[in-house]
Design a protein with these regions (language model features):
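Class I S-adenosyl-L-methionine
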Residues: 2-140
């Protein structure tokens, strides 16, 4: 259950692509699109979006350990700027993604389930419980 930055970045990119399409077409998501949207995890572990990606030479500023994220990050930014309703909206979306790096948190549903199962196996009466997945529709 290791955190794979590239997979998360790709899943987030697909979810954002769906959102941009839905916004343009002014319609609700299909079941298939909802499934893609459920895979969105935020950018809390993806500081790569803070790096420069405007031209291919920018990769030299990236740490070696994250250079495999250069191309998908570049594609994400290009997609947002080409698919958003207008340039101001695209800039707002990209800045929002960058700003969320330090404040976006995601708890995998497997972790929520493990905590829930562990609590259920005790005889403790729980009156209040912090739900680590607010917004993910996963509850303890």
């Amino acid at each position: 259950m290791a955190y794979n930055k590239k997979e998360v970045l790709q899943a987030n990119t697909e979810a954002i692509r769906v959102v941009l399409r839905l916004e343009k077409e002014r319609r609700a998501a299909t079941e298939t699109e909802k499934s893609i949207l459920r895979n969105y995890q935020g950018f809390g572990g993806l500081k790569c979006v803070l790096n420069r990606t405007d031209n291919p030479d920018d990769i030299r500023y990236w740490s070696k350990s994250e250079q495999n994220l250069f191309e998908p990050t570049q594609q994400l930014k290009q997609m947002i700027y080409s698919e958003a309703l207008d340039a101001n909206t695209a800039k707002r979306y990209w800045e929002s993604i960058k700003a969320s790096v330090l404040t976006s948190f995601y708890t995998d549903t497997r972790i929520v389930s493990a905590i829930s199962d562990a609590l259920a196996s005790t005889n403790l009466q729980i009156r209040r419980c912090l739900v680590p997945s607010i917004g993910m529709d996963a509850h303890i």
